[in-house]
Swiss-Prot record:
Signal peptide: none annotated. It catalyses: 2-(N(omega)-L-arginino)succinate = fumarate + L-arginine. Its main location: cytoplasm. Its EC number is 4.3.2.1. Belongs to the lyase 1 family. Argininosuccinate lyase subfamily. It comes from Bartonella tribocorum (strain CIP 105476 / IBS 506). This is Argininosuccinate lyase.
Length: 466
């Protein structure tokens, strides 16, 4: 760095020699934080308006600053702005361009402000906006799941535990389980947005400022509920970014579980669903292949969200108050995590919207593996008053006989069943069909069609105000 360039550095006054080339390389963040250009200009416009309102700068200076910032915004959005790595970050790139446009007046913009509170407010604005986008994407996914669930309230399928056939359920009930998961994700996004909705602008470097600024004015102008209450915490805090990544990682985990179901169900071994061409790819060598690549990539994106969360937690874990340069690394984690989550939500919403269901294969699978064995035991308890543990044992005996004969429970004769328990009568067979099993489970939240329809109605109503 030359002496002339050093003079142009905002912090260059107390230095005699410039930084090493590798220092410039590791110090520059413009390649990452240029994403914050709109938030940086928005924050600067609010700050300048407040400085004029409190008579810290002249109204005429504010008007020049405002005009210059709007020109810069247009230049960036039209692709005419040249970003410089020599100027380190988005803040200094914009400030340097403002100086070129309006002269020394540009230097008044940074009165009563530090890059510490400047980047804190920029980053909060970006995360807040992204949380809102993610929330909307979640709502769209939930809507598609509700459509699918309502179409398949009576589409019977096996329910699993340990990936082994457990009890018959419906596809509608199954999809509503994911609605509950993504509904919690939506709540977490809303909670995080509300908790972070405080403005750090005006905290300055860490101790506040001696200028008579109005932090409530800038907070209101930027859409924050109120200013942050402690200036040290204001510039030290990245909880809002960590909360976003935490909520995002949970959401990605739910997406990954659903993606895994899609991958399994679309395989030849299951044939429960058919994934559209729009979300599948082929093989370069095997012509018959239809690979569920979109679902696999959604499943993989979970690792990026988990990695981003752990990465930023690790950056922050040992930092003394207040700001440290380590925190410059925060944005790359968040930007990458946000992009991964947005892509995953969009892909999953598209897959669910295009999904074709093989009702016959699902029903056939539900009929296998003694899925109504619990109904057998429940009938013994309910109709004959037999203690459940004893009923469980008797049902096991019936299953062993059916396995030996290679038939279903309902295919055993009444005589064979009465050999296990003489009091069994023909009404037992009424509960051993998949349909009767499903429709009997009317407990709150159960798989009976009436309960699933109630769940769907609840979420349709809740989404209106979510």
């Amino acid at each position: 760095m030359t002496d002339e360039t050093l003079k142009n550095q905002m912090w260059g006054g107390r230095f005699i020699a410039g930084p090493a080339a590798v220092m410039e390389e590791i110090n520059a963040s413009i390649d990452v934080d240029q994403k914050l250009y709109r938030q940086d200009i928005e924050g600067s416009l609010s700050h300048a308006a407040m400085l004029a309102q409190t008579k810290i700068i002249l109204q005429s200076d504010y008007e020049k600053i405002s005009h210059g910032l709007k020109i810069i915004l247009q230049e960036i959005e039209e692709g005419d702005f040249v970003f410089s790595r020599n100027l380190e970050d988005i803040h200094m790139n914009i400030e340097a361009r403002l100086s070129a446009l309006i002269g020394p007046v540009a230097g008044r913009l940074h009165t009563a402000r530090s890059r510490n509170d400047q980047v804190a407010v920029d980053f909060r604005l970006w995360v807040r906006e992204t949380l809102q986008k993610i929330a909307q994407a979640l709502k769209q996914l939930i809507k598609q799941l509700l459509i699918l669930a309502e179409q398949h309230v009576k589409t019977y399928m096996p329910g699993f535990t340990h990936l082994q056939l457990a009890q018959p359920v419906t596809l509608g009930h199954y999809m509503m389980a994911y609605v509950e998961m993504f509904g919690r994700d939506l709540s977490r996004m809303r909670d995080a947005s509300e908790r972070m909705n405080e403005s750090p602008l005006g905290a300055a470097a860490l101790a506040g400022t001696s200028f008579p600024i109005d932090r409530f004015m800038t907070a209101q102008a930027l859409g924050f509920r109120e200013p942050t209450r402690n200036s040290i915490d204001s510039v030290s805090d990245r909880d809002f970014a960590l909360e976003f990544l935490s909520a995002g990682a949970l959401c990605a985990m739910h997406l990954s579980r659903l993606a895994e179901e899609i991958i399994l169900w679309s395989s030849e071994q299951f044939r429960f669903i058919y994934l559209s061409d729009a979300f599948s790819t082929g093989s370069s060598i095997m012509p018959q292949k239809r690979n569920p690549d979109a679902a696999e990539l959604v499943r993989a994106k979970t690792g990026r969200l988990n990695g981003a969360l752990m990465g930023l937690l690790t950056v922050m874990k040992g930092l003394p108050l207040a700001y440290s340069k380590d925190m410059q690394e925060d944005k790359e984690y968040v930007f990458d995590g946000a992009l991964s989550l947005e892509l995953s939500l969009a892909a999953m919403t598209g897959m669910i919207a295009d999904l074709e269901v093989n009702k016959k294969a699902m029903k056939q699978a539900a009929d296998l593996g003694y899925a109504t064995a619990t109904d057998f035991a429940d009938w013994l308890v309910r109709e004959l008053g037999i203690p459940f543990r004893e009923a469980h044992h008797m049902t096991g005996q019936a299953m062993a006989l059916a396995e030996k004969k290679q038939c279903r429970l309902q295919d055993l004769s009444l005589d064979e069943l009465q050999a296990i328990c003489p009091d069994i009568n023909a009404t037992l067979f009424d509960v051993l069909t998949v349909e009767k099993s499903v429709e009997s489970r009317k407990s709150f939240g159960g798989t009976a069609s009436s309960e699933v329809l109630r769940q769907i109605a609840y979420w349709k109503k809740r989404l209106v105000s979510a």
